[in-house]
């Protein structure tokens, strides 16, 4: 239930709200049979459901902290659920989590030193040092990495980055668009420690500015993955991100940054995947920060480090840097103080003792390595297991308000909305929690007047073509009135008493005398009840798109009756329920037979009979293949053409052909056989699809990839009898008897 996108120019909050509205509409259509979407923009004079009711229900579906945009790289954004393939995988995860807990206890059990034997207080030499005194067209002449010249690339023309007087020699002033990149510095993973230090000057109170990142190009917060140092509303945010906002650790300074003066900024990350491992320092002293996120679930992509700019995002406009340094370790507070020339002995004793433990206590260092390895092991196991979307309540979710005219960016702050439901339908039980669990219990409360009626009415429509409410998508004031209200009430009550047993209700309907009566109407019934609203005859139902396809596969003997498994492409011989569907881009054949595009909830399908449907049945390769396979099947089961055609009709229509139908099909067979016999000596006849032989040189299909087409037109039948039989089978598949249930 999401309508997210990563299209350029999309607004995250707009699509987040659209997704919430879609969930409300889907739930109201599906379970209540109401068009609540009508109340999204404003109240209606005679409609008991108000705009506040809509957004109160929206609060139930908007209580998760989500980003409205998907990752450009197609990753599943948290919160998600891992789909373990076996109990062994699930048990292994529990064991790995227990190993982490044990390692954390072992680390905590190591005593803090009683005295601060600081050892060396100066940090090791940085992995990268950029004095930024001299620039050339390809980079900085004096960039050093591990004592050697560093590979250094400019992301702009030579004149875009300006040299400016720095703390030591020259620094660089950024214009918001230009920056530079360190393509070889990629030790920026979730478990890799990092320290960034530089003299920095903020030239303005930036609403948003990227100082440092390894996220690659930027399509929105939901796609930013990697390390990120960002100015936001004059404050500094330091983050390690998998996918924002639900898989990231991030902190932000409590105070705004000082402007128009040089300061030494240091940002450290210890590789723990926890917000407690992030620290920010200004002039050697730790800055007070607030935790923004503390839920890093998976690894980030390992992109190169970029400074001062980011594609499709705001760069460090009017900001300056000098003496940029990078370490592949998290410096301690003592080492950061030493960078700024502060005597470590003036620091609080707790800070000194922490440094002594991390730098001189070998037992602590070994315990830390074991803990990090346990975390890596768990992450590797979890990332090997498929994930799928889930919803989870978050205290960080935005508060819900009535939106003026339903527009995402116009909340009416005078009209806050608590999670709730339309009380005009049924009052909320205050004993229940105000969340989706409470909603589920509200919907399934035996006293709720709608849910059971909507479900039974939909089952009735499935069996009889029309519901007892013909407008099964709308049981409200604007919908049709029930033709048999007492019957609907009785079935709804029995449905609840029977434990909401769908199979039992369907069995009851199809075993009823109403369903089993003839679908051929009398003249009087046709005149009085042409639409069969009063059920004077049995139902006449046109098969759905999925039924038509599955019926052809079953009759051909090619249907794979395996239950469960991954989705497959439409050319595979699996039931249609397993066919891969892409929202907004469903298989064309399904659309032609009235299947929905799945962009929005479709509580009731159209029921059409168009020439395009006949063309699909006669010419689509899948149906042609089915016709050929049926012909091959019946040619082995019988020898007489009349018997063969009878068998084909039974396989497809599940009944014997009437005499008139059989006569017509036999005539068609005789006629086509004669014509094809005349063509056979000089021209190919009907193509026969055969299973392609495996290519011994072809590589095995990678696990999880799309299935290859199972068959192609590989040979031509020169047998006029078999070709004519194929055409007859194709005609049967396209006949009204095959696609209509009576």
Where are the regions a protein language model picked out?
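Extracellular glycan-recognition modules
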Residues: 123-155, 162, 173-239, 259-262, ...
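Short, aromatic/His-centered strand-loop micro-motif at the edge of beta-sheets
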Residues: 239-264
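Flexible glycan-contacting loops in extracellular carbohydrate-active proteins
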Residues: 165-167, 229-234, 286, 290-320
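Primarily short, surface-exposed interaction patches in extracytoplasmic proteins
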Residues: 17, 48, 91-114, 118, ...
């Amino acid at each position: 239930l999401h309508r997210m996108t990563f299209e350029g120019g999309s607004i995250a909050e707009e699509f987040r709200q659209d997704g919430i509205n879609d969930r409300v509409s889907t739930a109201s259509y599906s379970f209540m049979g109401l068009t609540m979407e009508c109340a999204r923009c404003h109240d209606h004079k005679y409609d008991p459901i108000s705009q506040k009711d809509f957004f109160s229900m929206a609060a139930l579906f908007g209580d998760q902290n989500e980003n409205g945009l998907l990752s450009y790289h197609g990753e599943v954004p948290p919160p998600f659920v891992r789909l373990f393939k076996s109990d062994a995988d699930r048990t292994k995860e529990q064991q790995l989590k227990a190993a982490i807990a044990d390692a954390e206890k072992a680390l905590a059990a190591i005593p803090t030193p009683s005295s601060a034997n600081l050892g060396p207080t100066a940090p090791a030499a940085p992995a990268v040092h950029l004095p930024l005194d001299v620039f050339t067209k390809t980079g900085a002449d004096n960039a050093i990495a591990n004592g050697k010249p560093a590979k250094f690339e400019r992301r702009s023309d030579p004149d875009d980055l300006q040299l400016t007087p720095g703390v030591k020699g020259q620094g660089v002033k950024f214009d918001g668009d230009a920056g530079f990149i360190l393509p070889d510095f990629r030790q920026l993973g979730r478990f890799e420690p990092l320290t960034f230090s530089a003299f920095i000057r903020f030239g303005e109170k930036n609403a948003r500015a990227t100082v440092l990142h390894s996220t690659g190009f930027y399509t929105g917060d939901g796609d930013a993955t990697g390390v990120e140092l960002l100015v936001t509303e004059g404050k500094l945010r330091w983050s390690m991100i998998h996918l924002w906002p639900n898989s990231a650790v991030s902190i932000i300074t409590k105070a705004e940054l000082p402007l128009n003066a040089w300061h030494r900024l240091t940002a450290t990350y210890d590789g723990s995947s926890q917000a407690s491992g992030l620290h920010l320092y200004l002039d050697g002293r730790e800055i007070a920060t607030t935790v923004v996120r503390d839920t890093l679930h998976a690894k980030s992509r390992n992109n190169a480090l970029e400074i001062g700019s980011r594609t499709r995002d705001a760069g460090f406009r009017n900001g300056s840097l000098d003496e940029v340094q990078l370490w592949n370790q998290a410096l301690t507070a003592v080492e950061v103080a030493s960078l700024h020339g502060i005597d470590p002995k003036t620091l609080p004793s707790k800070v000194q003792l922490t440094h002594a433990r991390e730098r001189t206590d070998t037992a602590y260092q070994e315990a830390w390595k074991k803990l990090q390895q346990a975390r890596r092991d768990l992450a590797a196991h979890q990332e090997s297991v498929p994930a799928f979307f889930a919803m989870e309540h978050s205290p960080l979710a935005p508060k819900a308000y009535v939106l003026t005219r339903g527009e995402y960016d116009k909340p009416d702050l005078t009209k806050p909305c608590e999670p709730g439901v339309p009380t005009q339908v049924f009052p909320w039980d205050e004993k229940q929690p105000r969340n989706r669990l409470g909603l589920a219990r509200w919907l399934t409360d035996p006293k709720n007047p709608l849910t059971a009626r909507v479900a039974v009415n939909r089952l009735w429509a499935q069996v009889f073509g029309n519901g007892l409410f013909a407008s099964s998508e709308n049981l409200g004031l604007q919908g049709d009135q029930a033709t048999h209200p007492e019957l609907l009430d009785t079935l709804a009550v029995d449905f609840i008493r029977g434990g909401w047993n769908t199979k039992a209700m369907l069995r009851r309907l199809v075993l009823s005398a109403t369903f089993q009566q003839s679908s051929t109407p009398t003249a009087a019934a046709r005149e009085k009840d042409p639409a069969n609203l009063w059920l004077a005859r049995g139902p006449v139902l046109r098969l759905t798109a999925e039924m038509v396809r599955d019926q052809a596969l079953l009759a051909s003997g090619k249907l794979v009756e395996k239950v469960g498994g991954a989705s497959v492409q439409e050319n595979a011989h699996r039931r249609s329920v397993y066919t891969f569907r892409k929202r907004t881009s469903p298989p064309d054949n399904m659309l032609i037979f009235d299947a929905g595009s799945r962009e929005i909830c479709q509580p009731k399908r159209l029921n059409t009979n168009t020439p395009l449907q006949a063309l699909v049945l006669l010419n689509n390769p899948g149906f042609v293949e089915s016709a050929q396979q049926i012909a091959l099947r019946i040619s082995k089961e019988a020898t007489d053409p009349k018997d063969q055609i009878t068998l084909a009709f039974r396989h497809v229509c599940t009944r014997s052909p009437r005499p008139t139908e059989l006569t017509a099909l036999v005539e068609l067979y005789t006629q086509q056989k004669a014509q094809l016999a005349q063509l056979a000596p000089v021209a190919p006849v009907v193509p026969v699809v055969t299973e392609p032989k495996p290519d011994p040189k072809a590589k095995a299909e990678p696990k999880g990839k799309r299935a290859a087409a199972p068959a192609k037109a590989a040979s031509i039948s020169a047998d006029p009898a078999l070709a004519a039989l194929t055409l007859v089978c194709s005609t049967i598949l396209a006949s009204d008897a095959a696609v209509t249930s009576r």
